[in-house]
């Protein structure tokens, strides 16, 4: 930690004012040394970015300033946050039945605080922000006038020109804004180029003369510019500020005398390059439909003005358009002045409707008109600070903008004063710096009719559109809400006019407001309605929803069933309403529907519809399905249908279907299911948990499998250890070095396979398993009374267990769970192929899941066989490791991992078999066992017990006889 300063010590940084310069000036090296000394005293260091700011402070403001677009975005976020809180408060008062206040404190607006938009050449921004020795730059003007000046964002070329490429905004009190405008114009730079091709003095003598005789407030330098014929021509570049224009003219005339001596100077010896925003080319240069303005300037100034040919601004590439003016020094600067007078200027401000000289009607606030006598364009729209719903004591807010040319700024200020009410006792500024402009009498009368100027002071249309949609929805609900009298509100039918609603408050007569006029908030209490009325609305809603699904809509929107009460759930004789949220204000809350759950609506949005047969099947099937019989996270109980839906044994899962074709799971009977076959058979695969898995990374999802199994992937890299053995207690083997590439079946058997226990939190409602009717077998349902020990899990048992599985076929991994239903019908046990089972009953209780607990299963036949994903890893139980030792598996230190994992399972026992030997033994065996999904797990255990008894009888007979003899004595 650095040194801590005492509280009584004077903190120089705390009292530092960036706009107040010290009496003593320091050069860049001295400032940098002082900064390094101050940093080292506090055990800090000066970064490279800070060094650049200290050495070149003018670059800091230009590169790191708050852009105008950032300010607009901040205002939009502020307004959206405010409006959301306001509407939430109104909804809460309605839900609690409390009276609404007459007004709610809003964002304060001041009509005397305006935003002025002007055009400045972007090529001089770096000079405008620099000090230049006289302490006048953008920062000093901001401090002097108490305004906020924002340079435009760095423009990026696009298909259409950027209207804000050179637009500078000045925000503040209208009197201060005009002072800042004049200071910015006075400190604006310009550059003229002097041709040296016809001079009488040698170039090196001129360069020496310029270095030895500098001119105050004028910068001169030499530049080389190639001509069209390839010859390089040298020019003298002269740069100054507008306020130093007289000094530049005197310097240019003196140079003419020195260079040409007694001979007269050429007439067109000076050139000026003026940059213009391409968006305003038609408004500055003119067009064939209005008038060509550059010939007027040429006649008045006897100059030559040239510019690239154009038809319209959209055909001109780039955001900057260059105009070239050639003539003597006086005429060139005069022509520049006339061109600048044609630059667009606008002023924006927010104002209450009651603060206007003539308040407008709410429905007629979208105004765009031209005042012919003053040449001003007035545009008014609803303000972005106006809430969507106004209370009884609140007034509408307007956003007004006045637009014209820069030479007409005096009339623009006058129009601004006339818009405001007389209660604002002030006099608008009357600048006289454009009184001598030629455009007061030379500009055609119809030139401003096609004038258009976007300005930064107006926020983007996105906010206005959001409020327009919000108010339109509220107005539509108030018009089409369920009312006994069927009354509708009349609104003016204007094209761009904004529909508006007023929220009733306690001061108004609440009896005249319909009960369903306002959107029900998401936390509203239930609304009780007579039972027969609600049943009628349920039928109408179901019919409307069916029609919506026939048209291919993803789900009903709250705005589409305004004619009905809020959606309901019918349960016996009790009827409760599920309120919904406003779709604009509460955009983050999902829409809840009693008949269509939230997860069902998501299914349609995520569902593929690329196949024509798939879409046709959906349109036929969707209207007839009973959504009340589908499980949903939005309802508390699930009532199964009387006719359960038939499903195939091995159905393609939703997540497998959405991934690549190689990852689809193959059925046990060898039939590869595809998308068309599944939908033709009418199967549903829309489950919420699968869509939750879709949000994961696809590669990570296939690494971990459906429930944590690494072998769900069909495209695993052979030479990659995709599982952390220390974390999951998986035993990894290895063998000698590789000499040839593995075959397809070796790739499938390269990895370690595990038969493990499922977790007891897996049930049908949560996992949505696929079921298939299996033949009933009563002869093999009994379980041996003898206990099962650790010797149960052996290689021979696994051979018999997997004898009927075709391991050579990729993607075939049988996973079976036998479903037993007890006689009383109160509970159901699901027993997997590892011998563990779970009980699913009304109490949601789960019994112990060990091998001994299998004895508790009664003599019940198999009713269904269920394909279930792998359960999550449980380290409390042993695992059977099926591993094929080949010469391709000695990769990435498998020997160390194998040694570490030998003691990770139950009782420090791992059972390993060679799958290739297993396949060979199955092929050589003449015994044909039935398919594994047609057998009970008790059959497998009984056969295993017999095999163990046959193998151990010879080794234990002697020991048993000795024990019997000792016990007889």
Curated annotation (Swiss-Prot):
Protein localization: Cytoplasm; Cytoplasmic granule; Cytoplasm, Perinuclear region
Region annotation (gld-2-binding) ranges: 34-81
Expression tissues: Expressed in the germline (at protein level). In adult hermaphrodites, first detected in the transition zone (TZ), weakly expressed in the early mitotic region and in pachytene germ cells, and becomes more abundantly expressed as germ cells enter diakinesis (at protein level). Expressed in primary spermatocytes, but not in secondary spermatocytes or adult sperm (at protein level).
Predominant cellular place of this UniProt entry's protein: cytoplasm
Cellular compartments per GO CC: cytoplasm; P granule; perinuclear region of cytoplasm; RNA polymerase complex; RNA-directed RNA polymerase complex
Name of the protein in its database record: Defective in germ line development protein 3
Chain's role: Required maternally for germline survival and embryogenesis. Forms a complex with gls-1 which promotes the oogenic cell fate by freeing the translational repressor fbf to repress sperm promoting factors. Promotes maturation of primary spermatocytes to mature sperm. Required during hermaphrodite development to promote sperm fate, which is critical for determining the normal number of sperm. Promotion of sperm fate is at the expense of oogenesis, possibly through the negative regulation of fbf. Required during male development for the continued production of sperm and inhibition of oogenesis.
Organism for this UniProt entry: Caenorhabditis elegans
Note: The deletion mutant gld-3 (q730) makes no detectable GLD-3; it is predicted to generate an mRNA with a premature stop codon, which should be subject to NMD. The deletion mutant gld-3 (q741) removes the fbf-binding site from isoform A, but leaves the gld-2-binding site intact. Animals homozygous for gld-3 (7q41) enter meiosis, but are feminized. In addition, gld-3 protein that retains its gld-2-binding region, does not have the dramatic mitosis/meiosis delay seen in gld-3 null mutants. By contrast, sex determination was not normal; gld-3 (q741) males produced oocytes.
Biased composition (Polar residues): 487-508, 664-676, 954-969
Gene responsible for this protein: gld-3
Subunit and interaction comment: Interacts (via its KH1 domain) with gld-2. Isoform A but not isoform B interacts specifically with fbf-1 and fbf-2 in an RNA-independent manner. Isoform A interacts with gls-1 isoform C.
Entry superkingdom: Eukaryota
Traits of the deletion mutant: Loss of both maternal and zygotic expression causes variable lethality, ranging from arrest during embryonic development to soon after hatching, and sterility due to early germline defects. In these animals the germline precursor cells Z2 and Z3 are smaller, divide more slowly and their descendants remain small and indistinct compared to their wild-type counterparts. In addition, some of these animals show somatic defects, including a protruding vulva, multiple vulvae or a reduction in animal size.
Biased composition range(s): Low complexity: 631-644
UniProt-annotated stretches for the region fbf-1-binding: 860-949
GO biological process, one term: spermatogenesis
Annotated InterPro entries: GLD-3-like_KH5 (IPR041194), GLD-3_KH2 (IPR055002), GLD-3_KH3 (IPR049309), GLD3_KH4 (IPR049310), KH-I_CeGLD3_3rd (IPR055003)
Record-annotated KH domain positions: 34-109, 113-187, 189-259, 270-342, 344-419
């Amino acid at each position: 930690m650095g040194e801590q300063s005492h509280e009584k010590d004077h903190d120089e940084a705390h009292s530092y004012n960036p706009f107040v310069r010290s009496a003593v000036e320091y050069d860049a090296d001295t400032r940098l040394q002082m900064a390094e000394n101050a940093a080292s005293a506090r055990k800090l260091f000066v970064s490279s970015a800070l060094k650049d700011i200290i050495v070149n402070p003018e670059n800091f403001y230009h590169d790191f300033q708050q852009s105008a677009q950032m300010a607009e975005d901040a205002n939009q976020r502020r307004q959206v946050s405010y409006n959301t809180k306001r509407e939430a408060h109104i909804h809460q008062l309605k839900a609690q039945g409390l009276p609404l206040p007459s007004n709610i404190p809003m964002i304060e607006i001041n009509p005397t605080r305006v935003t002025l938009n002007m055009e400045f050449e972007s090529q001089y921004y770096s000079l405008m922000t620099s000090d230049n020795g006289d302490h006048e730059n953008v920062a000093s003007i901001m401090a002097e006038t108490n305004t906020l000046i924002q340079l435009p964002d760095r423009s990026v070329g696009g298909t259409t020109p950027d209207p804000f490429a050179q637009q500078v905004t000045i925000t503040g009190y209208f009197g201060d804004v005009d002072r800042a405008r004049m200071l910015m114009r006075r400190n604006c730079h310009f550059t003229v180029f002097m041709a040296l091709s016809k001079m009488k003095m040698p170039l090196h003598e001129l360069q020496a003369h310029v270095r030895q005789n500098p001119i105050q407030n004028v910068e001169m330098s030499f530049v080389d510019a190639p001509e069209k014929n390839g010859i390089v021509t040298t020019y003298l570049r002269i740069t100054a500020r507008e306020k130093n224009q007289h000094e530049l003219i005197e310097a240019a005339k003196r140079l003419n005398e020195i260079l040409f001596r007694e001979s007269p100077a050429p007439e067109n010896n000076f050139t000026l390059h003026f940059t213009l925003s391409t968006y305003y080319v038609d408004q500055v240069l003119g067009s064939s439909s209005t008038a060509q303005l550059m010939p007027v300037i040429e006649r008045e100034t006897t100059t030559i003005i040239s510019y690239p040919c154009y038809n319209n601004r959209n055909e001109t590439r780039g955001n900057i358009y260059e105009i070239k003016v050639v003539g003597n020094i006086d005429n060139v600067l005069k022509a520049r002045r006339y061109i600048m007078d044609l630059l667009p200027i606008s002023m924006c401000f927010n104002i209450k409707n009651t603060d206007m000289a003539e308040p407008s009607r709410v429905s007629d606030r979208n105004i765009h008109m031209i005042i012919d006598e003053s040449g001003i364009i007035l545009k008014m729209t609803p303000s972005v600070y106006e809430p969507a719903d106004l209370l009884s004591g609140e007034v509408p807010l307007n956003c007004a903008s006045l637009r014209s040319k820069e030479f007409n700024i005096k009339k623009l200020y006058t129009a601004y004063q006339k818009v405001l009410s007389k209660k604002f006792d002030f006099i608008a500024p009357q600048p006289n710096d454009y009184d001598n402009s030629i455009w007061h009498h030379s500009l055609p009368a119809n030139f401003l009719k096609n004038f258009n100027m976007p300005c930064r002071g107006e926020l983007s249309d996105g906010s206005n559109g959001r409020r327009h949609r919000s108010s339109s929805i509220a107005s539509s609900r108030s018009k089409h809400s369920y009312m006994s009298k069927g009354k509708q509100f009349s609104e003016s039918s204007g094209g761009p006019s904004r529909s508006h609603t007023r929220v009733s408050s306690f001061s108004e007569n609440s009896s005249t407001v319909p009960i369903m006029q306002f959107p029900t908030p998401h936390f509203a209490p239930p609304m009780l309605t007579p039972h027969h009325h609600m049943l009628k609305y349920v039928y109408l809603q179901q019919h409307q929803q069916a029609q919506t699904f026939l048209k291919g809509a993803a789900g009903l929107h709250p705005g589409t069933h305004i004619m009905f009460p809020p959606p309901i759930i019918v349960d016996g004789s009790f009827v409760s309403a599920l309120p919904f949220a406003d779709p604009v204000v509460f955009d983050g809350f999902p829409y809840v529907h009693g008949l269509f759950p939230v997860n069902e609506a998501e299914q349609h949005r995520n569902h593929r519809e690329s196949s024509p047969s798939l879409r046709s099947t959906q349109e036929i099937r969707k209207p007839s399905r009973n959504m009340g019989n589908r499980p949903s996270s939005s309802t508390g109980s699930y009532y199964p249908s009387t006719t359960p839906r038939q499903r195939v044994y091995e159905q393609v899962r939703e997540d497998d279907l959405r991934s690549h074709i190689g990852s689809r799971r193959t059925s046990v009977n060898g039939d590869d299911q595809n998308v068309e076959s599944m939908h033709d058979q009418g199967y549903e695969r829309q489950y919420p948990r699968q869509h939750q898995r879709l949000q994961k990374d696809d590669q990570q999802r296939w690494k971990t499998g459906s429930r944590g199994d690494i072998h769900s992937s069909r495209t695993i890299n052979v030479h990659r250890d995709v599982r952390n053995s220390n974390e999951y207690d998986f035993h990894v083997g290895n063998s000698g070095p590789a000499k040839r590439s593995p075959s397809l079946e070796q790739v499938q058997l390269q990895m370690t396979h595990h038969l493990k226990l499922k977790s007891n939190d897996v049930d049908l409602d949560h996992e949505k398993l696929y079921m298939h009717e299996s033949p009933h077998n009563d002869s093999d349902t009994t379980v041996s009374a003898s206990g099962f020990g650790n010797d149960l899990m052996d290689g021979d048992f696994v051979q018999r267990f997997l004898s009927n599985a075709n391991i050579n076929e990729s993607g075939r991994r049988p996973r079976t769970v036998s479903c037993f239903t007890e006689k009383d019908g109160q509970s159901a046990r699901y027993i997997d192929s590892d011998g563990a089972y779970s009980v699913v009953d009304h109490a949601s209780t789960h019994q112990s899941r060990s091998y001994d607990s299998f004895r508790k299963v009664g003599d019940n036949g198999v009713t269904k066989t269920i394909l279930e994903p792998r359960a999550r890893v449980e380290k409390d139980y042993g695992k059977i490791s099926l591993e094929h030792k080949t010469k391709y598996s000695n990769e990435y230190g498998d020997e160390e991992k194998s040694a570490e994992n030998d003691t990770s399972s139950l009782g420090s026992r791992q059972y390993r078999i060679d799958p290739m030997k297993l396949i060979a033994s199955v092929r050589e065996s003449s015994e044909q066992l039935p398919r594994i999904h047609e057998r009970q797990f008790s059959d497998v255990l009984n056969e295993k017990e017999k095999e163990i008894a046959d193998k151990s009888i010879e080794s234990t007979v002697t020991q048993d006889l000795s024990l019997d003899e000792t016990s007889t004595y």
